[in-house]
A protein has these predicted regions:
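Lipid interaction determinants
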Residues: 21-154
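Bacterial Sec-dependent N-terminal signal peptides
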Residues: 1-30
Length: 154
């Protein structure tokens, strides 16, 4: 009887320990989460401040359109996305206006990164999705974008 009671207590303690352990699950981003304005906060491993770089991406999920600011010039293009292939995304033929600015290197780097993007995923562990990483074909993180609260005048 004592042995049986001991095993029952041991079982209850074990179940209690497992129930108390919460595993943190990463937030999963859907295509609709992309809708809206996003500041570029990381590019090719470098941390950026969108208020200084003026690099903003605006996703219009309903029209599958991309617009924004590459730093100096406005950008526009289409989004290739198919519900059958979750988190696979491409930005073919991104175009820009043609204003000349003193330093175009950040803009060129952003446009090259957008051209290489093949998938996206949420960053962090809390909903709603506030940061999304964009990856290239070799699973290299090209960009991290952060949801903006206000719409920037482009």
């Amino acid at each position: 009887m004592r042995k049986g009671l001991f095993y029952i207590c041991l079982l209850l303690v074990g179940v209690g320990l497992f129930a108390g352990c919460k595993s943190k699950k990463a937030v999963v981003a859907s295509f609709s989460d992309l809708d809206g304005e996003w500041g570029v906060v990381e590019m090719n491993g470098k941390t950026l401040n969108p208020e200084e770089t003026h690099q903003v991406l605006v996703f219009d999920v309903a029209r599958q359109g991309l617009s924004g600011n590459a730093g100096c010039n406005r950008l526009m293009g289409k989004i290739e996305y198919n519900d059958a292939y979750k988190n696979i995304i491409k930005f073919p033929q991104v175009a820009t206006t043609r204003m000349a600015c003193p330093d175009m290197s950040g803009e060129r780097e952003l446009l090259e990164a957008l051209n290489k993007v093949v998938r996206f995923e949420a960053q962090g562990e809390a909903a709603p999705v506030s940061e999304i990483a964009l990856f290239g074909t070799n699973n290299d993180k090209l960009l991290v974008i952060k949801k903006q609260n206000k719409i920037t005048q482009l």
